[in-house]
């Protein structure tokens, strides 16, 4: 999959920096989104597992919300429809652009593992939430 800026990779082949990031799986997010673009029926497998708030990356949240709205409206959610939908809302560039959407669809092997990817995305979201609660100072009653 395409790695985005800010994912810990430096330019020009330098070593990857070890930055402490909250738990997430960009690969699971990308595979889930790509699978949904390839197979609209995969929505039924994942709708009860994951929501847009579970995605770590903002662009993935936007893409997931757009897919959800298209599916709820009975529309196809392939690359063309998704890019048109996001463009009309002036969110296409924030979602990574047409090229990123095409990459998601083209580099995803299919939708067979959509529920497994959704479970990973949800699990990492729950871990992030737990870390937030653990790191908050306790307040006396």
Task: Show where each model-derived region lies.
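Noncatalytic partner-interaction/assembly domains of nucleic-acid and motor enzyme complexes
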Residues: 1-126
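Single conserved hydrophobic/aromatic residue that forms the stacking wall/gate
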Residues: 132-141
């Amino acid at each position: 999959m395409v790695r985005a800026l800010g994912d810990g990779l430096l330019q020009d082949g330098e070593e990857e920096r070890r930055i402490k990031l909250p738990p997430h799986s960009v690969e699971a997010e990308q595979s889930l989104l790509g699978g949904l673009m390839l197979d609209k029926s995969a929505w039924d497998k994942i709708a009860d597992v994951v929501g847009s708030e579970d995605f770590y990356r903002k662009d993935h949240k936007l893409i997931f919300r757009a897919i959800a709205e298209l599916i709820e409206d009975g529309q196809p959610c392939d690359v063309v429809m998704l890019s048109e939908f996001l463009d009309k809302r002036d969110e296409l560039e924030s979602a990574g652009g047409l090229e990123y959407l095409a990459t998601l669809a083209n580099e995803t092997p299919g939708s067979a593992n959509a529920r497994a990817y959704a479970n990973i995305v949800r699990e990492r979201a729950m871990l992030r939430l737990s870390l937030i609660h653990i790191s908050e100072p306790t307040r006396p009653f």
